[in-house]
Regions:
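Glycine/proline-enriched, intrinsically flexible loops and inter-domain linkers
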Residues: 1-229, 233
Length: 235
């Protein structure tokens, strides 16, 4: 969400936008704990970043089974709770350190109810000068710019992977559903979007979720438009 707040900058009051975002990566962290937790915080940053806001603070809340239990007590087809807890913490920390984001509050809950599926929740708070955020309607002839890291084959199926049924075959296939994070690239975009001269050129901005180009670009168009025609250009 985004709200207007007064902020005092160099002794002068300015109109700023304050943004909040939270995201859960329960399924990705359950199957690939390092990447799942890393992209949990990465995804949290990505949403307010598309709103042209800079993320200043984060929070992490997780839930898992008792990490002290013996390996033999691990449920069939599951990673040990200790492996999940330690590797997820390393993944979250790695992404946060690379992008330079402080996590001021962490709460790790241990309960048998989280053995079936882990809880991995991240939350952030971001802000931007209201004058630097333009929200206008797209028009014919507008240019759609794809900005960020190169697209790979990782993460395919991630949008539906958390909801579909799994069997033992999934153990050898579902890890590829977890997107590979790219904190240094996201950090570059963060720094770019702190320049108001850049962000004021943007009519509408959207982040890439699991739906990819078709969803991200489609959401940029107004709901009453029947189609969006794209002519690809590589630079």
């Amino acid at each position: 969400c985004s709200i207007h707040v007064p902020a005092v900058v160099n002794g002068k009051e300015q109109d700023w936008l304050l943004m909040f975002k939270n995201e859960t990566h329960n399924h990705p962290t359950e199957i690939e704990p390092f990447g799942g937790a890393a992209t949990c915080i990465g995804g949290c940053i990505r949403d307010p970043l598309s709103g042209r806001a800079y993320v200043h603070q984060a929070m992490r809340v997780t839930g898992g089974g008792d990490p002290r239990k013996e390996l033999a007590e691990t449920l069939s087809g599951k990673l040990p709770q200790r492996k999940l807890a330690q590797t997820a913490a390393a993944g979250y920390s790695s992404y946060g350190n690379q992008i330079g984001l402080a996590t001021g509050h962490i709460a790790e809950l241990y309960h048998e109810g989280y053995v079936a599926k882990r809880l991995e929740c991240g939350a952030v708070v971001a802000a931007a000068p209201a004058d630097n955020v333009v929200r206008e309607r797209p028009a014919p002839g507008d240019v759609v710019i794809l900005l960020g890291g190169r697209t790979g084959r990782d993460g395919i199926g991630g949008a539906t992977g958390s909801s579909k049924s799994h069997d033992m075959k999934s153990l050898s296939t579902m890890a590829s559903e977890v997107q590979k994070g790219n904190a240094p690239e996201e950090r570059k975009i963060q720094r770019l979007f702190r320049d108001g001269a850049v962000t004021r050129l943007i009519k509408r901005c959207n982040d890439f979720g699991a739906g990819g180009v078709s969803v991200a670009v489609g959401e940029l168009a107004d709901g009453d438009r029947k189609s969006t025609r794209l002519n690809s250009s590589h630079h």
